[in-house]
């Protein structure tokens, strides 16, 4: 696994972990603000969630993530970054050259503006391929059930149809790669 991939996946896991630990009251406040806001509401909700993750990582609350703070958070997730790797992560993410990752730099990193969009798309293509039956170009309820079964999850075809329906934008009963990408966001 490359350093960029390791960095991105560790930060993504941290993002999910911290986001899932938000209190119910925070969720209710966000739901209310999302309901009352315009179309940019979903975007600002994402920024709010990223702010929560950033604040969690910024242990000393100085508005910046240091190499030590980054290393500590990755360690909490069961990952490991050497001092050299941490230095490289900070160096590649640190646009203003102050030796830290500020919130704007963190946003760019998490939104894929660090040049890793192609890598992310390639990873998603590989994951998509796991769910697709040979010779097909989409995920069907049967192929989803088969893959989930191989992963130890039992699920009926009808339940898989319901899962697919949630992300099937053109109502054709299957998931295309683009629909899969939306689902994985």
UniProtKB/Swiss-Prot annotation:
Ca(2+) 3 binds at residues 168, 170, 172, 179. Induction: By touch, salt and hydrogen peroxide treatments, drought stress, wounding, dark and infection by the bacterial pathogen P.syringae. Transmembrane segments: none annotated. Residues 1-45 are annotated as: Disordered. InterPro entries: Centrin_CML-like, EF-hand-dom_pair, EF_Hand_1_Ca_BS, EF_hand_dom. SMART domains: EFh (SM00054). Keywords: Calcium, Metal-binding, Repeat. It comes from the Eukaryota. GO terms for molecular function: calcium ion binding. One of its GO terms (biological process) is cellular response to hypoxia. Residues 21-34 have a biased composition (Basic and acidic residues). Residues 45-80, 81-116, 119-154, 155-185 form the EF-hand domain. Pfam families: EF-hand_7 (PF13499), EF-hand_8 (PF13833). Expressed in cotyledons, stipule, young leaves and at the hypocotyl-root junction. In mature root, expressed in the stele, cortex, emerging lateral root, root tip and root cap. In mature plant, expressed at the base of cauline and floral branches, and in rosette and cauline leaves. Expressed from stage 9 to 14 of flower development in anthers. At stage 15, expressed in carpel, sepals, petals and pollen until dehiscence. Expressed in developing seeds and young siliques. Ca(2+) 2 binds at residues 94, 96, 98, 105. Ca(2+) 1 binds at residues 58, 60, 62, 64, 69. GO terms for cellular component: cytoplasm; nucleus. Residues 1-12 have a biased composition (Polar residues). Residues 35-44 have a biased composition (Low complexity). Binds to ABCG36. PANTHER family: CALCIUM BINDING PROTEIN. Potential calcium sensor that binds calcium in vitro. This is Calcium-binding protein CML37.
